[in-house]
Amino acid sequence: MRYWLMKSEPEQFGIADLARVKVEPWTGVRSFFARAHMRAMSVGDEVLFHHSSVTPPGIAGLARVVRTQVVDETQFDPASPYHDPKATREQPIWDCVEVEYVATLPYFVSMDRMRAEPRLAEMIVLQGRGMRLSVQPVTEAEYRAVVELGQIEPPPGAPKAARAAKRATVRKMGAPRARGTKRVAREAKRPPARPKAKPKRARSR
């Protein structure tokens, strides 16, 4: 058995959504590094469900891999932001795994709480390199340390942030999200900014 951290934006698909649907394909990953991690997964692997693009970000719950090597259908959908025109049914480029809901942690484990925990000093999500990948490996010790933190009420000064993040796990009410639209924090790199042209100096005559 192996352990993983998988990121998702809670306003698109959070732990509350996974609790509702029970099982969901983890579509929309468009990083070859993250894809390689998913290809290394096995049925039964445990997952830390990370909420990204919220204040504060952190671990909201637990999931488990129930199916591997699933073709990511969003790559074929021209209306999807994850459409890949190079992908074909005969030669798909992107695959994913299906995960099932396991639990919502009693207490949200923010990144600040994780940074303050010595047992998590080497955890990839807390490092500069590789921290932005939406799928990352974690050690068994790191997984168990995070689960333990999720059972303990945050110290004074932290509960407000934890409660705010917990509220963020529930998506804003409105039109239901269509299945297959994605929830993963995207790894797409922004194009480099063009240098600003220097203003020309007027020549003295």
Model-derived features: positions:
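Classical protein tyrosine phosphatase
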Residues: 57-61
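Short, charged beta-turn/beta-strand-edge "cap" motif at the junction between a beta-strand
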Residues: 50-56
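Charge/polar-rich, low-complexity and marginally structured segments
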Residues: 104, 119, 131-158
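GIY-YIG nuclease signature motif recognition
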Residues: 6, 62-66, 139
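Aromatic- and Lys/Arg-enriched surface recognition patch
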Residues: 64-133
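Compositionally biased, charged N-terminal/linker segments
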Residues: 1-43, 153, 161-167, 171-183, ...
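Hydrophobic beta-strand signal
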Residues: 48-49, 64
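RNA-binding accessory domains that recognize and position tRNA/RNA substrates
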Residues: 205
